[in-house]
Structure formats: structure tokens, C-alpha cells
Amino acid sequence: MNKGNDDLSKLVAQIEHINELAYIQYKPIAYDLCGRIASIDEVEHILDRMLDFCGCDEILKLFKQICKHYYEIYPEMIAYEINSYREFWDNE
């Protein structure tokens, strides 16, 4: 294996590790938010931060759970967050 592939493999491993850490941090937060009615500012803040990690399937599932829970409560904000996700992560 050449140095370029080695460096790329290390980078991928680091990103996967960061995603794992983010999931560990966001999972209880997502469960907490879905178990109550939080303020629009709190939900928006968490979704904005989670957006950076939505390339990770597990975090994307948490993001979607929060969006589903709050869609009827804060429809405009949730629509904005979903559109932000699409702009950032959708490749089509």
C-alpha cells in the first residue's frame, strides 16, 4: 500500500471515530428532546449542530426522529432544517 492510500485510510478511520463520538453525545440529547416539548431555539440549536454529522447513518436517524417529533410544533423551522440537510448532504 502506498503512502497516499495509507493517509487516506487513516483519515477515514478518524472521521469514523469522530462520528462514533458524535453519536454517543447526540443519542441521549435526541431521546431527551423527543421525550418532551423543547423550545424552538433549543431544537434548532441541536439540529444545526447535528447537521455536520448527518453523513453518518446513525446520526441521520436521530436527526430525522427529532424532525418528525417537532414537525407539527415548529413546521417552518423543521422545514428549514430539512432543506439545510438536503443542500449540505444530498448529491442529486
Pin down the residues of each PLM region:
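Amphipathic alpha-helix face/heptad-repeat signature
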Residues: L11-I18, E81, Y85
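Amphipathic alpha-helical binding modules
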Residues: E58-E92
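Short, charged, low-complexity amphipathic alpha-helix
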Residues: M1-K10
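Amphipathic alpha-helical interaction modules
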Residues: A13-K61
